[in-house]
């Protein structure tokens, strides 16, 4: 049993088939199939049921997948510890960033990190908090930005804590106000976030607490697109203040939102509790402490 065989097997499951696994691993489909077959032979049991182009884990495969992910994670951590001996002259940062504010908050930090550590390769994944958390637990990511977690499986470092603003069409009856209460938007169609965004849950909880269910008309993880829909008169979107400030455009007004205290965008950078953090990840966290988010004057 070899690590390359374990990695091929894990990627077949994660990517949904041999062809996609081969693309991820930069080897041919036949090479992936051969490595999985060799793994099954060495273990003496089938790990996959092959149904046409589909694959499904056998009972043994489920056990092996769990152990293989743990072994690959330990292998990666071993390599990371060895990389530390080279003082970041090489290495890899597997980083997750929130979709909503990638350009607003992280483009400059990303560039500064690359300037300081040009030989560190960055593997970047953007997504909602659920996607980031799952990727960290599986070992796909080492550290990532997420709404502050309550799950003890994660350790975290606070990054920012932003209120939400409301972006409204300029012809909305409340558009001339300086602020708006969440319950005043009960009859306005809502543009929501992707389902992987935990912020959706907080918004729904806040609305239900105030006695209404928001009228959802669409979802997106792209703040620019959501603002464009507002400008087209499609509804209201609630966005972190630091993001909303940069999205005001013709046809859109920004109002301060009055809502329950828990409806905030409190981003932390999280990692698996007890996991070894590579020097590359430690350097990223140190950079975040060096350049904290500053609240602008409203």
Locate predicted features:
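Hydrophobic hinge/microswitch elements
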Residues: 128-133, 137-141, 147, 196-255
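Secondary-structure junction motif
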Residues: 189-210, 277-287, 294-298
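A short LG(V/I)-centered, amphipathic sequence patch enriched
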Residues: 14, 40-62
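Flexible hinge/capping segments at coil-to-helix
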Residues: 154-190
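Short helix-boundary/capping micro-motifs
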Residues: 10-28
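Central regulatory/effector-binding core of bacterial HTH transcription factors
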Residues: 88-152, 213, 219-220
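Beta-alpha-beta core module
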Residues: 153-158, 162-163, 177, 224-273
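A late-sequence structural motif
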Residues: 105, 253-296
């Amino acid at each position: 049993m070899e690590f390359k065989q374990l990695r091929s097997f894990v990627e077949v499951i994660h990517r949904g088939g041999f062809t996609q696994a081969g693309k991820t691993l930069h080897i041919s489909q036949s090479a992936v199939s051969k490595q999985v077959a060799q793994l099954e032979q060495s273990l003496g049991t089938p790990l996959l049921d092959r149904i046409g182009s589909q694959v499904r884990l056998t009972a043994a495969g489920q056990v092996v997948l769990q152990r293989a992910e743990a072994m690959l994670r330990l292998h990666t951590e071993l390599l990371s510890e060895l990389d530390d001996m080279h003082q970041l002259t090489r290495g890899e940062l597997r980083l997750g960033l929130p979709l909503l504010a990638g350009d607003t908050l992280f483009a400059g930090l990303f560039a500064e990190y690359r300037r300081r550590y040009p030989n560190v390769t960055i593997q970047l994944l953007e997504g909602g908090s659920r996607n980031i958390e799952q990727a960290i637990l599986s070992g796909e990511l080492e550290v990532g930005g997420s709404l502050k977690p309550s799950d003890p499986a994660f350790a975290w470092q606070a990054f920012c804590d932003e209120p939400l603003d409301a972006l409204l069409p300029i012809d909305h009856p409340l558009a001339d106000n300086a602020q708006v209460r969440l319950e005043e938007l009960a009859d306005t169609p809502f543009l929501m976030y992707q389902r992987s965004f935990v912020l959706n849950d907080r918004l729904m909880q806040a609305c239900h607490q105030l006695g209404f269910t928001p009228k959802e008309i669409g979802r997106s993880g792209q703040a620019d697109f959501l603002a464009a829909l507002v400008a087209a008169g499609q509804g209201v979107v609630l966005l972190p203040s630091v993001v909303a400030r940069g999205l005001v455009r013709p046809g859109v007004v920004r109002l301060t939102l009055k809502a329950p205290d828990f409806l905030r965008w409190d981003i932390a950078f999280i990692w698996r509790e007890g996991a070894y953090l590579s020097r590359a990840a430690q350097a990223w966290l140190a950079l975040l402490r060096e350049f904290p988010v500053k609240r602008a004057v409203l």
